[in-house]
């Protein structure tokens, strides 16, 4: 169990990305991009759908909400062009058709299926080793280290500015940002600013110590 990445190339040399989330028990999630930058997902080895279908089915409904969550990520924007759904219910039913082809379409049935597939610990479990690998690869600190901040980073608990725009993120600063449970960080790249989402996993001791200190010092 765990999360695994791959990079291939099309005939013109364009990089194609893939990712597989393998649980100890339950449905696989397989992600891939194509030559047109469309981002697809396969749920439990079924036919692929645009990633935005799955995002809608998980409750982030409209295009505007998806862009607000992920930023203007080109692969998300390209996926909109292949996504016939426009809201939560349509996304849910579109995904249900791929997982249970031929069965009667009903929102209640689709909701029940998604809940049982991914939110029932008896049917979906990464196990400790899978969770460890997942958190290690998706840790915020490793994804923002040595990057340049595109916006100020603010502690969500205190409102304190942890780092200013233009700062290069050291390992120490990356640890500080991660352990403050900052939900996302904007970084600069040559092409554009990128929103890096956190998995919100913190060093428990560091986070508890920081919260306790804040509560003791606040008037």
Regions found by a protein language model. Give the residues of each.
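N-terminal non-catalytic structural scaffold regions of very large proteins
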Residues: 1-216
């Amino acid at each position: 169990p765990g999360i695994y990445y791959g990079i291939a190339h099309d005939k013109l040399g364009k990089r194609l990305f893939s990712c597989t989330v393998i649980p100890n028990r339950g449905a696989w999630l397989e992600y891939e991009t194509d030559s047109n930058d469309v981002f697809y997902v396969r749920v439990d080895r079924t036919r692929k759908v645009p990633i935005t279908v799955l995002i809608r089915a998980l409750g982030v409904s409209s295009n505007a909400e998806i862009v607000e969550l992920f930023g203007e990520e080109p692969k998300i924007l390209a996926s909109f062009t292949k996504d016939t759904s426009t809201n939560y219910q349509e996304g849910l039913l579109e995904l249900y058709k791929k997982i249970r082809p031929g069965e009667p379409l009903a929102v209640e049935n689709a909701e029940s299926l998604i809940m049982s597939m991914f939110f029932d610990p008896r049917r979906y479990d990464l196990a400790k080793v899978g969770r460890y690998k997942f958190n290690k690869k998706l840790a915020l600190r490793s994804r923002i280290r040595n990057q340049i901040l595109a916006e100020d980073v603010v502690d969500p608990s205190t409102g304190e500015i942890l780092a200013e725009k233009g700062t290069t993120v050291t390992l120490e600063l990356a640890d500080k940002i991660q352990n403050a449970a900052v939900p996302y960080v904007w970084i600069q790249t040559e092409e554009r600013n990128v929103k890096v989402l956190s998995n919100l996993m913190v060093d428990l001791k560091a986070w508890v110590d920081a919260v306790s200190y804040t509560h003791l010092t606040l008037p």
